[in-house]
Amino acid sequence: MKNVIEDEILPDSANDIKVEGFAIQSEEILDKTSGHWDHYRENMFPAMEMEGESYVLRPMNCPHHMMIYANRPHSYRDLPMRIGEIAHDFRYESSGTLKGIERGRHFCQNDAHLFCTPEQIKSEVADVCNLIFETYKDFKITDYRCVLSLRDPADKKKYHDDDAMWNHAENALREVLTELGIHFTEEIGEAAFYGPKLDVNVKPAVGAEYTLSTCQLDFCLPAKFHLTYVDKDGSEKTPVVLHRAILGSLDRFMAYLIEETKGKFPTWLAPVQVKVLPVSEKTLEYAESITEKLVEAGVRVALDDDNQKIGYKIRAAQQVDRVPYMLVLGAKEAEAGNLSVRDRKGETTTMEVDEFIAKVTEEIKTRAYNN
């Protein structure tokens, strides 16, 4: 299911540069430069010594994407530049906060950093918000609220100490969200250590509200890494960075989906979309031919060729695996060359093979929620 989300919901077109195969550890100096070492060390795993160098498991991807940008000179014509990846991150969360795949010490997140000019902030924030809310439509997420997360000015230890930068960043993000017509509340002390952020919080079926998506405005890290671009007048300027996470931790998002759907995923998202159930060995050959046709059509299909009674196979597929569609194939179906289609509700319909394939592929294409 994670692969489906990555391939279908988080398209490469949202990024100019897609990072793959990045090391899960980095030199300690990167986190010291970014400020993570000073402001986030209690949530990081201890440093490791290897061949005379000190490395840490990366808790975030910001420093690495900064270094990709810094790898070559840039002009204002190059901006906005979007660097994204499906990243493996590691955070030493306290044991009391751990909660299955919803909150662990190792997780995958869809993460991107958008490098832009100050004039491009509004359009980039708008694009991020549109991408977030369009993605929510795909998953039928309607119960959410937007929060402008600000720093606590009195907490100098938690936040980068630059009042002018913070005032500028908070006012800029507040102004953009207001202009975009996004209704939001403000919460003090919830910002990232380097800048304010828009948090989109959801209320899961079980448990407390949590942040699913973020868009963070950052004037701090580009300056710390001495990032520049050449402007129209030939002068060097520092870019602004937006930290974008459309679905945040994919592990947490899968936990959210499991709770919301009770494991009954829509056809387009289900790990197995169709399960083929031959009644006996006599219809196994026909079942195999149907399975091949579904595979050729791009359907995720599984063939249950175990020597079990058909009632057992149906219960396992419907109640345990919660597969959207089951094809019960007996002698009657094999002789007629058609299908007995059973859905999760237990309703059974006789359909032609091509008719069923067209139905399933249309549900996948349109991301329908009708089963």
Report each predicted region and the residues it spans.
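NTP/phosphate- and nucleic-acid-binding module
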Residues: 1-371
